[in-house]
């Protein structure tokens, strides 16, 4: 199993307003990261265009090269499930667990 211990985070102080359509793009983009990073060289960037004037969600996920593909996916799944709590609906975040990392923003990086 992957090591999902929390290492560090950097959270934007600006919050996504409740009910904002950006949540939808962000959710879709995080699901994309979770599903594809293990099969994309363990370092994968993607984006989801916004609907209804919502900003595009940009993201990147990285897994440690020493873990299996299934552990990479499991680590990112764990992190996606925790990122809202760690960065409480921030418009941008970087969170590192021992075996994986996710960054998301409203701008390309």
From Swiss-Prot:
Domain of life per record: Eukaryota
Matching PROSITE patterns: GNK2
Every Gnk2-homologous domain range: 4-109
GO biological process: defense response to bacterium; defense response to fungus; killing of cells of another organism
Name of one Pfam family that matches: Stress-antifung
Function: Exerts antifungal activity through its carbohydrate-binding specificity.
Protein name: Antifungal protein ginkbilobin-like protein
Gene name in the database record: EMB24
